[in-house]
Design a protein with these regions (language model features):
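Soluble "head" domains of membrane/secretory-pathway proteins
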Residues: 2-180
Length: 180
């Protein structure tokens, strides 16, 4: 959420040389469903956080509010209508769904009345297709393309604090929550 302070494991995908960002020790690759922090393509001074949807070589499509990976529709089950509070209040009334990527289930928000960017892309080697869980209010790979491996900062794993300015302070319920 807006206002989250995130803990990131910068070594999840390998050890890199500072400044030139070259990987010197490979400790693994991003997996579908990982929540990853990366340098924004259009302004590398900004870090973005999104979910890995497409891996190198994947064909990723987004049609009628559903993700397709290599021609297979990703499972999505409706849960309830989202009741946002504080900084999440602007999405109140969105459909809260469980989405299953590989073996990882996570929540997403869908606003049926909002138009969505639809289309298909083949993820180039060394790149990743990223999407936000707030599907109809997310600036992600549907708009600016795939993320090159060298832009990866690390894997997000917990929210250590949230500053909710609209509720005048710390959102105590989010402290220490794990990111799935």
């Amino acid at each position: 959420l807006i206002g989250d302070f995130i803990l990131v494991n910068k070594f999840s995908y390998g050890i890199r040389l500072p400044v030139i960002n070259t990987k010197v020790i490979d400790l693994g690759e991003p997996e579908r469903g990982d929540v990853m922090v990366f340098r924004y393509l259009k302004d590398p001074s900004l870090d973005y956080i999104k979910r890995v949807i497409g891996l190198p070589g994947d064909r990723v499509g987004y049609y009628d509010k559903h993700v397709y990976i290599n021609g297979q529709k990703v499972s999505q089950d409706p849960v309830d209508l989202y009741q946002g509070v504080g900084q999440g209040a602007n999405m109140t009334g969105a459909q809260l769904n469980h989405e299953l990527l590989s073996v990882r289930e996570h929540d997403i928000l869908i606003m049926q009345e909002r138009p969505s960017i639809e289309g298909e892309v083949i993820v180039p080697e060394g790149h990743y297709f990223m999407m936000g869980d707030n599907r109809d209010n997310s600036n992600d790979s549907r708009y600016w393309g795939t993320v090159p491996e060298e832009n990866i900062v690390g894997k997000a794993f917990a929210t250590w604090m949230n500053w909710d300015a609209s509720n005048n302070g710390i959102d105590w319920k989010r402290l220490g929550t794990l990111i799935n």
